[in-house]
Regions:
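Acidic donor-binding loop of glycosyltransferase active sites
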Residues: 78, 219-236, 249
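Conserved active-site histidine-acidic residue motif and adjacent donor-binding/catalytic loop
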Residues: 63-69, 197, 205-221
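A charged, aromatic-enriched C-terminal amphipathic alpha-helix characteristic of glycosyltransferases
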Residues: 15, 277, 287-314
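Donor nucleotide-sugar binding/catalytic pocket of nucleotide-sugar-dependent glycosyltransferases
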Residues: 114-145
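Short hydrophobic beta-strand element within catalytic cores of glycosyltransferases
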Residues: 250-255
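Short alpha-helical segment that forms part of, or immediately flanks, the ligand-binding pocket
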Residues: 218, 241-246, 260-261
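Conserved catalytic-core segment of nucleotide-activated headgroup transferases in glycan assembly
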Residues: 137-201, 207
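N-terminal strand-loop element at the rim of the active site
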Residues: 8-14, 21-68, 197
Length: 314
């Protein structure tokens, strides 16, 4: 049995924390290893609810820096310490093997640690011409068909466009402007956000708090007919996009973004838009009854498949 430490620079509702939680769980339940969580107690974006969920499942240790982790490891004797971070050369823990899982584009000179891998095939291809491995992130969605429409007073026949992600990640201004126009044009269209800073006050533009609760997350996604993605940078993986796609939802996303992993991962569900006018037209003409099938993606990003690939980067 291996002892694997998982380090989080911040412990919150975002994709890194979610994917590390699933990796750490499956490292124990499937690979039969030991998972120990370390998180930076000084991070301003830590969320108590997320910390509580980790503590329920794992030994969870707060630290203020990696030197402290190194001191603790003199007794723990971890076999590996896993970092999911931007991928540029950074601090490591010298008395353990370090696994670096890079989430952003990096050139090959940023390679460091014992093993180095990207989180998507797109990153590996773009940054290393496929020379470096990639290990896709796991997607965990509970088998639950319930939704939040009744609770949020959204009619069953309404068209609902939703998004969840980092608080500032819905940052394309022209998309926000389209939303403001659409709610005036069509009373049957709703917009639903989770963990996004409120940018408009309207009864059909609904903002809900972020959560680490997987049941609430899947109910949120079930409430939507489509995802409206508006992150100007794009995605180096796109965990929230994959979550919507696996629930057979189409994904409206900006066609000119730089990081395009979600175009490859969710290719059968992507509806690109290119301008204010284009998005406005596509939202108004959207057919919510069209069926999407993501069975192949479900298998590719399943917990069993992704933990097998994770094992290869140890």
């Amino acid at each position: 049995m291996l002892k694997v430490g998982f380090y989080l620079r911040e412990l919150n509702f975002r994709g890194i924390a979610n994917s590390i939680y699933i990796y750490a769980k499956n490292n124990q339940t499937i690979l039969k290893n030991k998972s120990i969580i370390f998180y930076n107690s000084t991070a301003l974006d830590n969320r108590p609810e997320a910390i509580t969920e980790f503590k329920k499942k794992f030994k969870t240790i707060k630290i203020s820096n990696l030197n402290e982790l190194e001191r603790i490891n003199k007794n723990l004797k971890l076999d590996y310490i896993y970092f999911q971070r931007d991928g540029s050369k950074d601090e490591i823990v010298n008395n353990s093997k370090n696994i670096i899982h890079a989430v952003f584009p990096q050139n090959i000179f940023q390679y460091h640690g014992s093993n180095y891998a990207f989180i998507s095939k797109w990153l590996s291809k773009t940054c290393s011409n496929n020379k470096f491995a990639f290990a896709p992130l796991p997607v965990q969605l509970l088998k639950n068909n319930q939704n939040l429409r009744a609770k949020l007073k959204i009619p069953k026949n309404a068209k609902v466009f939703g998004y969840h992600g980092g608080e500032t990640s819905f940052d394309l201004v022209f998309v926000r402007d389209v939303i403001k126009k659409v709610v005036k044009q069509n009373e049957n269209v709703y917009f639903l956000f989770m963990n996004i800073g409120k940018f408009f006050n309207h009864k059909r533009v609904i903002f809900t708090k972020g959560t680490f609760n997987q049941t609430q997350k899947v109910k949120f996604i079930n409430s939507c007919d489509a995802m409206l993605h508006a992150r100007s940078l794009g995605e180096s993986f796109g965990l929230s996009c994959a979550e919507f796609a696996i629930k057979n939802k189409p994904i409206f996303t900006y066609g000119f973004c730089r990081q395009r992993a979600h175009f490859e991962i969710c290719k059968n569900n992507i509806i690109p838009y290119y301008s204010y006018e284009d998005l406005n037209l596509k939202i108004l003409s959207f057919n919510k009854d069209r069926k999407y099938n993501s069975n192949n993606l479900k298998k590719e990003l399943s917990e069993k498949n992704t933990i097998k690939i994770f094992k290869k980067i140890l």
